[in-house]
């Protein structure tokens, strides 16, 4: 049944360029790799600047070279993984609200690639995004030393708006081993029900005038962790979108040192023509940066 729906989806959308959306705050792995660029030459990805993105590309490229696919075709397969940053999608059918179905049949593996690990499938091979590299580049969340949770507005940038729809947001559990790919058993649900489509508040990584804002409360993690977001369309085809973003917590005392954060805040406020609100006291500026939770001025980790 799911295979039939995927085939129908492909037939309907084949003539057009498909585009849907991606995590902009925090920033999806595949979007960071796309924004870095330099993945078209040479074929083997040697010019890709970021180590994890380069490794992800090479994992797909050499996978198909090992199957005797010629270099250009293997490169196109790996490039597609970055090019289609807005379409990390899977089709569930009318039972999209059956979470066991999602976990067991729709995206049973390769979670950060939306279950896509075959170049001949509708959504291609995005398995490089799921590789458990230790050098995925995280977004940094700054919090007070005694702050046990972090409140923020997650942004999902729609390149095509789909309504009705809903979101589910997860993070990896505190005992997750980064040396292994993410599985559903290693994810903890933290929210998504209060999502809203709002005017873009200044998210520089989203070109759309509208953005989905999803308020969540993130429990503290002592090590680098992953946020996993599902954006599910409510329709008979049941197309959903699945993105991974890497995160790490830093305490203000250890990382910010007030003056550093004040400089960042002043720079961002000036950029958005809000100079009148700037307080040049370093401690106060740093405190305001933490209180804002970077919902508008989030450090994208580029």
Swiss-Prot record:
Gene3D superfamilies: chitin-binding protein cbp21. Keywords: Disulfide bond, Glycoprotein, Host membrane, Late protein, Membrane, Signal, Viral occlusion body. It comes from the Viruses. Glycans are attached at residues 193, 293. Residues 1-19 form the signal peptide. Its main location: host cell. GO terms for cellular component: host cell membrane; membrane; viral occlusion body. The keyword Cytoplasm does not apply. It is found in: Host membrane. CDD domains: Fusolin-like. Homodimer; disulfide-linked. Component of the virus occlusion bodies, which are large proteinaceous structures (polyhedra), that protect the virus from the outside environment for extended periods until they are ingested by insect larvae. PANTHER family: CHITIN-BINDING TYPE-4 DOMAIN-CONTAINING PROTEIN, GLCNAC-BINDING PROTEIN A. This is Spheroidin-like protein. It comes from Autographa californica nuclear polyhedrosis virus. The lineage of its organism: Viruses, Viruses incertae sedis, Naldaviricetes, Lefavirales, Baculoviridae. The gene is SLP.
